[in-house]
């Protein structure tokens, strides 16, 4: 996970407590299974946990590597030394997604062996595309690509058929929760992953997941619970405003994140129930506590997270002209909740 929204201070704080209790993982772990060796990426951090996991898969002299870390020199040394010590070569590199902490080591790997073929769902120049359902085989391992966007638009998981195990990338982590670029798509991908019924997960960050079905179920439950809480807050506010106004209508404008009426939009008033919508900050206060509203990380992380859920509700049709609640997005971070 790297870049933009994911690198905000909010997420550093979100995972910091968990990170302090993370188990220590070996730099190289060849005891995960008979055909999977894990190499840490030497990039520990609040978002990367113990570091990015990269996996050497197979049992023969030619194997497949999943992900390449962010480009730490120690990682390249660790991998190439292991290959030389065990007389192993890499035929293919499969990249789970475009984030730099998973793709940054490609150049070092190709410098070691230019014959390696690099695969990514949306390939960069010189790389090959990965199609959903595409199979990659090496001695002792058969990997099937599963398109699972949401955390990233090009996110791929890989199902190891011999073990009924899933390389989960950043969709499901070994500790805590992941984050998403597109919440609705991400939730759909989690459900798709659950349907694969894999027993073990090899995540992009953190320790191996020995109870993958339960972990995915927990991820989905957490997403759904937050969605329901935000929707309930909107519904309660709409009912409360309708009751106070006796069901009457009046002209309203948009509501800014500070809760103030927007003068420009007031010039375009329409006949709506006499209520002012909740601002993103007000919803954040009701969901996470009032102190969140004035947090320096609200604009960088909490607000965008809430807007993800609000847009998802709109896209799902849970907030539309045909039900009692309508969320009208007039500009980013501005919305009203009239009763229809």
Curated annotation (Swiss-Prot):
E.C. number: 3.1.2.-
Composition-biased stretches (Low complexity): 242-258
Ranges in coiled-coil conformation: none
Signal sequence region: none
Record's keyword annotation contains Hydrolase: yes
Binding site residues for Zn(2+) 2: 101-102
Binding, Zn(2+) 1: 97, 99, 205
Reactions performed catalytically: 3,5,7,9,11,13-hexaoxotetradecanoyl-[ACP] = dehydrocitreoisocoumarin + holo-[ACP] + H2O; 3,5,7,9,11-pentaoxododecanoyl-[ACP] = 6,8-dihydroxy-3-(2-oxopropyl)-isocoumarin + holo-[ACP] + H2O
CC cofactor: Zn(2+)
Family matches, as Gene3D superfamilies: Ribonuclease Z/Hydroxyacylglutathione hydrolase-like
One biological process term in Gene Ontology: secondary metabolite biosynthetic process
Keyword Mitochondrion on entry: no
Family designation: Belongs to the metallo-beta-lactamase superfamily.
Protein name: Thioesterase pkgB
Provenance organism: Emericella nidulans (strain FGSC A4 / ATCC 38163 / CBS 112.46 / NRRL 194 / M139) (Aspergillus nidulans)
